[in-house]
Amino acid sequence: MPALKVIATPIGNIEEVSPRVKAALTKCEVLFCEDTRVTKKLLGLLGIDFSNKQFIINNEFKEKQNLSKVANLIHQYHCGLVSDAGYPSVSDPGHILVEYVRTQLPQIAIEVINGPSALVCGLVTSGFPESPLLFLGFLDHKPTQVTQTLKHYQNFQGTIVLFEAVHRLQQTLEVIQTVFSNTEVFVGRELTKLHESHYWFNTSAPLPDITLKGEFVIVINNHHTQPVGQYSDQLLKQEITQLVQMGVKVKDACHYLAKRLQLKSNKLYTLFHESD
């Protein structure tokens, strides 16, 4: 069955390329690329001969124009979709092409070739709870729109991840300070690259001295602390019961819930057994 291979590429370190990714890049005769120069450089570093490959620019301006091309090419050649770094369609071009194949070419499979993700890397490095999770990607270029977007999600109870360019980082962090009070924030710079660096700070404190160079992932820990009294006993028992019904031990369920809601595990354990 013909397939469109959606291939994740390194976000910084060339060694992030798995044998499966390399095999897919080698096999593809046609590559839809965010930037053909970047893709050719990657293939060169991997020792892949691309002299007989066809490269088609697939950036935000060209993606819709490529729909007819993929329809014609995918029945004749092995076709792949790549972005400059990470996964196509995750804050990069790609989803329009994938959606077209899914809806208009049902006889064509969509095969994702897994690899690195700045979203996952930033989230894991932050050490913040992984769920609920809200991913905003790159925000609007206009400062007023950035403020409006972040205020819209101000009351989201969870972890928020976004990407930012170096020339807008300082401005965006200042908006985050204004919108999210007394909140932990992580900034990852040049993740998996040689000069990778990490910064943690609280929005109630001054911004750290961040090297303004490279690419950035921002993670906001918007899990708000609340006094025990603000959670009803009935709701807490219900949450523990649901976890137990899923096969989780009572002690582990209480520990998990206590960590998530920033409560005392022993108090939850006592509360759960009060009616026993």
UniProtKB/Swiss-Prot annotation:
Q: Does the keyword Magnesium apply?
A: no
- Cross-referenced SUPFAM superfamilies, in alphabetical order? Tetrapyrrole methylase (SSF53790)
E.C. numbers: 2.1.1.198
Compartments annotated for it: namely: Cytoplasm
What Pfam families does its record include? TP_methylase
**Alphabetical keyword list:** Cytoplasm, Methyltransferase, rRNA processing, S-adenosyl-L-methionine, Transferase
User: Which GO terms label this protein's molecular function in UniProt?
Assistant: rRNA (cytosine-2'-O-)-methyltransferase activity
Name of the top EC class for this enzyme: transferase
Q: Which reaction does it catalyse?
A: cytidine(1402) in 16S rRNA + S-adenosyl-L-methionine = 2'-O-methylcytidine(1402) in 16S rRNA + S-adenosyl-L-homocysteine + H(+)
Signal sequence interval, chain numbering: none
Record's GO cellular component terms: cytoplasm
Q: Which family does it belong to?
A: Belongs to the methyltransferase superfamily. RsmI family.
Its job: Catalyzes the 2'-O-methylation of the ribose of cytidine 1402 (C1402) in 16S rRNA.
Task: Name the NCBIfam families for this protein.
Answer: 16S rRNA (cytidine(1402)-2'-O)-methyltransferase
This chain belongs to which protein, by name? Ribosomal RNA small subunit methyltransferase I
Q: Which gene encodes it?
A: rsmI
